[in-house]
Amino acid sequence: VLPGNECEKNMHKAVEEVNLSDANLVIINGDLTNEGSDNELANVKSILDKINKPLFVLPGNHETTWSQSATKTIFDLWGNDRFVTELDNLVIVGIACGPYMKMGDGHIKQEDLHWLDKTLAKHCTAGKRVISFNHYPLMKDLDNYDDYIRVLRKYPVIAHVNGHYHKYHKYVSENFGNINCMMVRSLDMKKGNYGYTIMDIDADSVKFHNKQLGKEPVYVDGFAVSYPSIDGDVESLANQQPLYTD
């Protein structure tokens, strides 16, 4: 989104639609801006402030790679670059992914892995299920994706949701982990296709719907709720302590 461009105009429309919907909460999963400048971020913040539902914002590579403030502006505007919240029996959690060097790979900082592990250990009481959010997929786009998966694998994660590629694509976490994952659309999918994703989660399934502005939602894909099977890559989950301790 740039001040005055078509994305800005359609972000306003998306906010209006969301405010009239029955959505429980809103998650912005990175790439809010083109170049991550302070001016662009402040402009997006002024639009998102009109959302009348709980809002959680994660930065993407466009916010970190070209940040004018070493990502400090994200904290100044939204208070943090990670979040956790609960909705009924769901624990919804998201962390940042960099890159923290220009043109580098995505990277999960050790302090964020530490926070994720401790946070899920605290929130995952009996009967809880986890939805994980990150701008990057659980693939080699993240240079330490295996460490990330090892933390997630300890908890009842039923889905990981990412952006970055600006398309819909269902996949399973790369190489190990067996975590069900879904890439989702961006606001602008070109050729006048502006919109967002609606997630429906019930006891048995996670479903993703493409919501083009001004049109009815269309089912895209989904999966039955299941939990990653234990394999040789990760030690038994039973009585496992946090990987990252103070």
Q: Could you describe each region identified by the protein language model?
A:
Residues 24-26, 130, 158:
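Conserved acidic residues
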Residues 118-140:
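Short acidic, glycine-rich surface-loop motifs adjacent to enzyme active sites
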Residues 132-139, 158-168:
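Histidine-centered catalytic micro-motifs
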Residues 1-42:
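N-terminal active-site segment of His-dependent metallophosphoesterases
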Residues 3-6, 32-39, 64-68, 138-142, ...:
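Acidic-and-aromatic substrate-binding clefts and catalytic sites of carbohydrate-active enzymes
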Residues 200-246:
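A short C-terminal boundary segment appended to hydrolase-like catalytic domains
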Residues 38-126, 147-159, 170-184, 190-202, ...:
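Extended active-site neighborhood of metal-dependent phosphoesterases/phosphodiesterases
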